[in-house]
């Protein structure tokens, strides 16, 4: 009942259904860790009455040109808070669309050679991501400088040990990060909405347009199933099909034009008109 009350409260605060679903699924993941399925305390139907589905939305990713601008803009030309927000955004993109929560919870020990080995906060799935050369200078510049720091980046409060308090700390950091992204877009991409989800959706979408198989994209994102990935990409599949349809029509029309040209050339030869050649 309290979970349902929380859902109602979120709706009263104008929360979107996908946002509510994210909160509920995050709570469910935490609950499953504290009370694993099969334990005496576990209640299998605890989340049955609340919204945990994902609705396919209009596209939330950037175009290739927009992403290129964010990757090539000189960070030194931006205000300090925007510099860090854009640096984290770039790293999330370079790390195969890593969610901000996973970036925030990364630990120093997760760096193994030239890779990051970590468990996704949402699913517990282990991920291994190679650090590309484009990310190495950012990683060096923005990682925690404190020698005894547990976390790779100075996002979470080192002194907080309680899981619930640490998650509250993460939510504050997330709000601060999104505000930094708002300032960034006001400066670099006016009228474009960018949030913490955008790096992940952009990576998936651009990979899709590059021709990567959905199964490969799903594995790269650490999705629990291909269906989740299809939800990410559904708004873009119609666009891709429409573009393919345009290409098909153009190729057929041009083929007809080529045939008509050849027919005309034959006719000209037949009636004795010289054929102009290039």
Stretches with model-predicted labels:
Residues 53-72, 125-132, 147-150:
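DNA breakage-rejoining catalytic core of tyrosine-based enzymes
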Residues 77-80, 148, 178-219:
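Short, basic (Lys/Arg/His-rich) helix/loop patches that form interaction surfaces
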Residues 67, 132-191, 272:
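Active-site/catalytic core of tyrosine-dependent DNA strand-transfer enzymes
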Residues 61, 120-124, 159, 221-246:
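Catalytic-site neighborhood detector that most strongly recognizes the C-terminal catalytic loop/helix
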Residues 128-133, 137, 142, 234-278:
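DNA/chromatin major-groove-contacting recognition/catalytic segments
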Residues 109-115, 190-193, 212-231, 256, ...:
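Short, polar N-cap/turn motifs at the start of nucleic acid-interacting alpha helices
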Residues 95, 105-141:
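Conserved tyrosine-mediated DNA breakage-rejoining catalytic core shared by Y-recombinases
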Residues 1-58, 73-77:
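N-terminal core-binding DNA-recognition domain of tyrosine recombinases/integrases
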């Amino acid at each position: 009942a309290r979970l349902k009350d929380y859902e109602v409260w979120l709706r009263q605060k104008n929360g979107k259904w996908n946002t509510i679903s994210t909160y509920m699924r995050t709570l469910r993941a935490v609950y499953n860790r504290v009370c694993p399925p099969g334990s005496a305390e576990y209640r299998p139907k605890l989340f049955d009455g609340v919204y945990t589905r994902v609705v396919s939305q209009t596209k939330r990713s950037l175009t290739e040109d927009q992403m290129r601008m964010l990757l090539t803009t000189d960070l030194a030309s931006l205000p300090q808070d925007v510099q860090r927000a854009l640096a984290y955004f770039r790293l999330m993109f370079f790390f195969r669309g890593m969610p901000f929560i996973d970036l925030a919870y990364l630990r120093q020990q997760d760096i193994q050679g030239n890779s990051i080995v970590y468990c996704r906060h949402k699913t517990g799935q282990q991920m291994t991501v190679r650090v590309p050369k484009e990310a190495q200078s950012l990683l060096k510049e923005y990682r925690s400088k404190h020698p005894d720091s547990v976390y790779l980046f100075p996002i979470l409060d080192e002194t907080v040990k309680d899981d619930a308090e640490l998650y509250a700390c993460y939510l504050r950091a997330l709000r601060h990060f999104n505000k930094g992204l708002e300032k960034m877009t006001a400066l670099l991409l006016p009228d474009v909405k960018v949030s913490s989800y955008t790096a992940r959706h952009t990576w998936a979408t651009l990979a899709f347009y590059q021709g990567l198989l959905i199964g490969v994209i799903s594995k790269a994102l650490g999705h629990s199933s291909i269906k989740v990935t299809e939800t990410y990409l559904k708004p873009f599949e119609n666009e891709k099909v429409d573009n393919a349809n345009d290409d098909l029509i153009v190729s057929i029309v041009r083929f007809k034009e080529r045939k008509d040209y050849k027919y005309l050339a034959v006719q000209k030869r037949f009636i004795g008109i010289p054929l102009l050649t290039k």
